[in-house]
Amino acid sequence: MRKHTAGLRLVDVAEQAGVSIATASRALSGAAGVSEALAERVRAVARDLGYVANVHARSLASGASPGVGLVVHEIGDPYFAEIASGVLEVAGTHGRMVQICHTGRDPFTEVAQLRALVNARVGIIVVAGSGRLDRDVQSRMKAEVQAFESVGGRVAVIGRHPHLGVDAVVPANVEGGRAIAEHLLGLGHRRIGIAAGSRRLATMADRLDGVSRALGEHGLTLDDLPLVEAEFTLDGGKEAARRILDEHPDVTAILALNDDMAVGVLSVLGERGVAVPGDVSVTGFDDVTVAGHLSPALTTVRLPMKDMGRQALELALLPRAARPRRRTAEQELMVRASTARVRG
């Protein structure tokens, strides 16, 4: 049975869990130096005592607007920087401070950051970036979100996170993947290399699904094309490009599934003296600010990233609905100078 939470302190959690106050603090904040088994035991005690609920009650009682937590995979990635800009804009109009957490694309760091934000007394959390198709990660994320919402917190996500059951802004990744592949196929390309991130990311699975649909209309499958999974970064794009070119030197196009990877692809092609688009066409996905200023300017799929950030926080500021709300962020094909009709 839960204790009455008035006046509940960290020392109460520590005593009940049989640990020091310092250890309890580290466990609840997600800090290093505590084993996962011990941290989970302390969190279970805190949940049973209602300690998190007490933290939020004190925050609300202070009269201040609870802050906003924003979880991103990589703050240096222009995709997430644009999203953060939208979140900050809306937060500013509501007088709320934003705390940004960077996960370094590590799923377990993402779970720890969620926990840290809850214990930092934010009232809203926006999770930006792809959901993960990993049941263990999904289960841990869901547990943190449910605990937060059970004490009045609000959560919204950007991307497909079907296991969380929260309000979401979902980019049209399937449609975008289809559009960019159809563009290359329409230019006569059939020997297309694909530079992809991990298929354990829902974003990647969706973009590849769209590409697959376009290929199917031309009698091809993903298995017919060289596909390299690498980090969803510029360096990952370089790695993918090198492998594609080394193993399949006859490719006439490389389809990168985000703009960061596309920049890496362009870099490797430049190093090897491969003309773009004369020898190899290159495409990206997202349309980050720099995409239109590259040489050659990058053909890509535009997503309204800043608006996605705005919409996510706007959803989270609304009272919780009986069923999760979902908004779709539409895509637009941006044809620029990095693609051309296949030679011969």
Where are these regions (language model features)?
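Short helix-capping segments at alpha-helix termini
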Residues: 93-94, 151, 215-222, 246-250, ...
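Flexible loop/turn connectors
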Residues: 242-243, 247-344
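Short acidic/polar active-site loop segments enriched in Thr and Asp
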Residues: 20, 123, 189-191, 252
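Short acidic capping loops at alpha-helix termini that bridge into adjacent secondary structure
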Residues: 190-191, 222-226, 276-281
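N-terminal helix-turn-helix DNA-binding module of bacterial transcription factors
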Residues: 1-64, 208, 343
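Alpha-helical recognition/docking segments in bacterial nutrient-uptake
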Residues: 1-5, 63, 67-182, 186
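Hinge/beta->alpha junction and helix N-cap segments in small-molecule ligand-binding domains
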Residues: 73-82, 100-109, 131-136, 160, ...
